[in-house]
């Protein structure tokens, strides 16, 4: 049947000829399976392309890319499977002289996270994940990117707030040489919020190169490393004891955007040879955001964009 249908990509002449670096599709809706027991899989968005070196050809075969993507992603996703998929994409376009292929998969990984203090209480967190793979000249590179939300409290604002509180205490008790401990505690209970530092939800985007011999993506492990370094990840289900514990964590981990970037750099350098970090504080004091970027000394890939 298809033999009788017109194919203008083959039959129609065209006047513009040039090789193309990448041609393909993006934002394809497709499920991915992180393990064999994941059932219907995670809802993902895929982008897939090959190069088109033959300048005289009008275009590539989009349907071949789609069918191969669909076929391979019916299997559990793994670092070992991605080179096979990329090579299949290249081979499917031998008539186009394609030598390179690339793929990105984006999805949200749902993780149940325990509350800080309340026993038996937990809630769901959605972590944006992006896996990018590229094959060129027989060499495959794989990158894993995760996004982590955390709270940041400004050290400068905290110092200014402490000064205001101290000044208020001195002003109200200038007449007294000594105060009972209970009176001091009661004053702090009544006036401890005389001034409060500004804090805000913040986002860290971390991208790492995965070694060629890696056995798994270890997505949860990477998320755990980031949250451990930052110490103030946003919470899901909370009761008052959990909220109080979160306030304590923020007080013990005051940080500028520079501090957050350096914390992540130190943590990741102990586990990955090549990585990139981009952090953004959605300032509650300002109408703009504060940002910082860093990476490994041998960082070779383009920085992530928040």
From Swiss-Prot:
Its EC number is 3.5.4.16. The keyword Coiled coil does not apply. Pfam families: GCHY-1. Keywords: Hydrolase. It catalyses: GTP + H2O = 7,8-dihydroneopterin 3'-triphosphate + formate + H(+). The keyword Hydrolase applies. It comes from the Bacteria. GO terms for biological process: tetrahydrofolate biosynthetic process. One of its GO terms (molecular function) is GTP cyclohydrolase I activity. It is an enzyme of class 3 (hydrolase). The record marks 154 as: May be catalytically important. NCBIfam families: PRK13674.1-1 (NF010200). Converts GTP to 7,8-dihydroneopterin triphosphate. This is GTP cyclohydrolase FolE2. The gene is folE2.
